[in-house]
């Protein structure tokens, strides 16, 4: 089960594929692979554990497409992401979707939308959270095996991880150490803590929300 977001255009299906591939290739976290059935633009950011895929297929993958407003035409392109990602990671991908929609005049659709809609970040995030809840109900054992960290805490930590390399580059002449947080779990309480390893011979930047 994945969260899927489908892309449409209004009134026509024209799309310059060279420009689309250039858009994907410009992103340093994306690699493009082609098979006989589809083109996959795979987004992978190891720093925050973010994996996502844009698929360009030969046939439509939109469920119940017949019930949608016919003025919107399916482009056979969709985004697929894990249904239980941290919301910070979801926001990173949705920001990329925003750029995609703005550049190519795309509209978006998810099975929880009433119809195809213009890009609205809050609409996509809300539908993702609903899919997350449905996934939790459908696969309770998988959910209970997860470790819980408060949303504001994990968002701040992931934001730091996402920006860490840029921070290092900006401060390269100051000999600052930017540690990578690790998560440890108390065997007694089950609570998860964020900790870092420090170097004795360097000044360091203390990451946000570390315990």
Labelled PLM ranges:
Residues 39-43, 73-81, 203-205:
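Generic recognition of long tandem-repeat/solenoid scaffolds
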Residues 1-49, 147-162:
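Short, extreme N-terminal segment that most often corresponds to the first beta-strand
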Residues 123-211:
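Aromatic/basic-lined ligand-recognition segments
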Residues 8-10, 44, 57, 82, ...:
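A structural detector for beta-sheet-dominated domains
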Residues 38-73:
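Short, solvent-exposed beta-alpha or beta-beta edge segments that form flexible loop/patches at the rim
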Residues 73-81, 85-102:
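Elongated alpha-helical scaffolds
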Residues 111-122:
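Short proline/glycine- and acidic-rich turn/helix-capping motifs at secondary-structure junctions
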Residues 26-32, 98-109:
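Structural alpha-beta junctions
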């Amino acid at each position: 089960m994945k969260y899927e977001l489908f892309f449409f255009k209004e009134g026509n299906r024209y799309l310059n594929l060279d420009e689309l591939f250039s858009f994907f290739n410009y992103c340093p976290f994306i690699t493009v692979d082609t098979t006989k059935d589809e083109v996959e633009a795979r987004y992978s950011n190891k720093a925050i554990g973010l994996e996502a895929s844009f698929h360009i297929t030969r046939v439509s993958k939109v469920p119940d497409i017949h019930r949608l407003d016919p003025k919107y035409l399916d482009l056979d392109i969709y985004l697929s992401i894990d249904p239980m990602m941290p919301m910070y990671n979801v926001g990173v991908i949705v920001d990329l979707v925003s750029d995609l929609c703005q550049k190519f005049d795309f509209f978006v659709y998810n099975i929880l939308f009433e119809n195809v809609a213009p890009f609205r970040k809050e609409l996509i995030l809300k539908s993702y959270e609903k899919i997350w809840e449905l996934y939790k109900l459908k696969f309770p054992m998988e959910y209970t095996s997860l470790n819980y960290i408060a949303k504001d805490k994990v968002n701040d930590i992931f934001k730091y991880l996402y920006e860490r390399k840029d921070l290092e580059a900006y401060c390269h002449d100051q000999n600052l150490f930017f540690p990578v947080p690790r998560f440890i779990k108390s065997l007694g309480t089950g609570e998860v803590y964020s900790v870092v390893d420090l170097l004795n011979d360097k000044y360091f930047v203390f990451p946000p929300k570390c315990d």
